[in-house]
Regions:
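Extended recognition/assembly regions associated with phosphoester-bond processing machinery
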Residues: 1-206
């Protein structure tokens, strides 16, 4: 595998199907057209919304995700080059600063965390040391928050998105990059525009 596309899905929450379809199409494009074997990693996020109609006594004790994303879910730490994809860091989607406190995971280089916001920042280092970054993915699932102050804030800051992690050589990756996704599932990654009609090259001369 040369490229990993990382996003996050919340439990008991509908998936943005247009986003998922476009992400799969982009994965196939990178693999077949660009010749770089690509995989999709979806981080499972857990959140209990007591004001959701499906939160009855039977469902409170169980976690489930939409069938469409089950095959892409990862539940542990994924080491990819010098990037750590932390699929078991259970960060509340209403957290204001989701990367705070996770700097310790950046031992080798970069860290990717699952969260509903699109965050990216570089980490302190000594001169000559390897660049280290930490970022969050954004969600592939729709808004599903409690009717509370924290829930209302979380809904306002909810972002669709994913992170592209690409190997530079055997042991290192290029800096992971955030890709923001529109509500209709379309997105732009560098010079590639992806929507329901497929993947298109952007004319950089315009």
């Amino acid at each position: 595998t040369k490229v990993v596309l990382v996003t996050t899905a919340q439990n008991k929450t509908a998936v943005n199907k247009d986003f998922l379809n476009n992400l799969i199409a982009y994965k196939e494009y990178i693999t077949k057209t660009l010749g770089k074997q690509t995989e999709i990693v979806i981080i499972p996020s857990r959140y209990r919304n007591p004001t959701n109609n499906i939160e009855d006594d039977k469902n409170k004790a169980s976690d489930w995700w939409e069938d469409d994303v089950e095959d892409f879910l990862f539940y542990g730490k994924v080491n990819f080059g010098n990037t750590l994809i932390s699929c078991d860091s259970h960060i509340s989607p209403t957290a204001k600063n989701p990367t705070e406190g996770y700097e310790i995971l950046a031992e080798k280089g970069h860290v990717v965390l699952g969260h509903s916001k699109n965050h990216f920042r570089t980490l302190p280092r000594f001169r000559g040391d390897t660049l280290k970054t930490i970022c969050t993915t954004g969600y592939i699932t729709t808004k599903n928050y409690s009717r509370s102050k924290a829930g209302e804030t979380g809904a306002l800051l909810h972002s669709y998105g994913f992170v592209v992690v690409e190997l530079k050589d055997k042991d290192t990756c290029y800096i992971p990059r955030n890709v923001k996704v529109k509500s209709d599932g379309s997105f732009i990654d560098i010079t590639n525009s992806v929507d329901k009609n497929g993947v298109h090259k952007i004319n950089s001369s315009l």
